[in-house]
Amino acid sequence: MECDHFIELSNGKLKRALVSHQKKGVISNGRTGSNLWITHYKDKITQNLKDTLAMMDWNERHGIKVFRLSSELFPHKSNPKVESYTFDFAIPLLKEIGNKAKEYGHRLTFHPGQYNVIGTPDSKTFQQTCKDLQYHADVLDIMELNQDSVIVIHGGGVYGNKKETINRWIR
């Protein structure tokens, strides 16, 4: 997984944690980034959003009115192995993207990865799917876009029983 790759790359570069069992100042045996990666990546995320605005301008000049946004605008946003973070620092740019989409009449969409499967019989996979889809919905909501800005969802497999899978979708 992507997060495992990130952790592997950072091995030996992370400092020992100064918090253990909620006691400050106690050195633990584990190593942690203490969510420092988000501080490092805020600039990258901000640049991604600015690049999105530039791509929208290019699309408008070339008559392209539908734009699929990258699910990686906010890296690791729904990754269960990474501490959660807020969109607060990016809200002004997200609103600017939404305003530009409305001004240009662009339809913005998301198409989350194939690992999002609503019909799965596995409750853990389903919960992770819900978390990831919520992240995408939150981004579109912050942009204040209408119902034409959609999240395209993979249907997934039938898991040996098409009727039961359809019922899981309905639930």
Ranges and model annotations:
Residues 1-107, 116-119, 124-127, 138-145:
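Alpha/beta catalytic barrel-like cores
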Residues 73, 114, 155-157:
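Short, flexible loop/turn elements at secondary-structure junctions
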Residues 111:
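Conserved, mostly hydrophobic/aromatic
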Residues 130:
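Carbohydrate-active enzymes and regulators
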Residues 133-171:
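Eukaryote-skewed repeat-based solenoidal scaffolds used as protein-protein interaction platforms
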